Amino acid sequence: MKSIAVCAVCYNRKDSLARLLSSLDAACYPVPVTLIISIDRSDTTAVEEYADGYVWRHGEKRVVKHQKNLGLRRHILSIGDWLEEFDAIVVLEDDIYVAPSFYYYAQQCVERFADDMGVAGISLYKYPYCADSRQPFMPMVTDSDVFLMKRAVSWGQVWMREQWLEFKKWYDVHSEPFGVLPHLPRGVCEWPESSWLKYHIRYCIEEDKSFVVPYTSLSTCFCDLGTHAVKRQTHTQTVLLQGEKRHWNLNPTVTYDGFFEAECLYGHFSEVLGVRKEELCIDLYGSKGNRMGRRYWLTREQLPFKVVRSYALEMKPWELNVLHEIEGREIFLYDTSVGAKRPHEPDNDKKADYYLYSTDLDVRSILREKVMKTLVDAKHAVFGQNEE
């Protein structure tokens, strides 16, 4: 059995740490677990005092108090040093909250993927949206409990010894600041230099490494105010697995790239049209912009190029419309080497909004309810709550 420690990474947010530790305390553990509380130097001792007094009921507790301020990037990366002692480590920043079964999941994933060097790490977190476009992210569902994504995760993750050592070798060569690169998400490139995650994401994309991601999240993020958050937000909250689940089917057959695009579409177009992967830009979320200059471009944008194929925006997730050849005029495969008149589909933006954000309710009904509520609120403001 692999040894797996849990590390709570802290700075100056005592209440955040207390919330994280409450979720860890309520979780299920099949074996004694070492809890590491790693605290970066700040101008308060409240976090250190809380950590010292905290009683960990599930195994050994170790409190690390850094005497100098490392900063977020150096602090997070230093956690990897614990892999000299443990086979794997669950890394949790203090604004994370874990599901009761997170350790069972981590344990089984480590046993399954520890020798797979194509896997860079294990995510506890499942994105509810594409991090680059902020549109809903719906992965294709299979009989597996996990899928693969060529993008590192920071809102609950597991690092394994051999995979981490390989990343560290890469990082030691690529640790210098970098600007916008065409093969990386623009937003990631523009993150501040205090970000460690931008380097791990770059590593996954450039070295063709994947994170294992659950279909149902084992962690969620409160996005508390801190180094990279200037206001409280809820978009990082995701559906959290409840109850005690002890067994996972860990046979991923679906892979997404670092831009949240389905990699199976490369194989589809290779089989159907003979288009090679190196010639194709899959850009359904619109985050790539074909900055690599690929000849074929799959996108929802209406562009002045020859349309090779077009598809509907009906099945979910949207890549199924392509895989099942559902004809329509919402998704276009262009040959950018041939200029042509732009497609004229003026209602496509509205259709996309309805497709992405509506429920079974008609959009007009939703708008009608909003208008009526506004009128009622205005009436109450003028005449009082009890006015008929």
Where in the sequence are the language-model features?
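Peripheral/terminal regions associated with large enzymatic or DNA-binding modules
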Residues: 1-92, 96-388
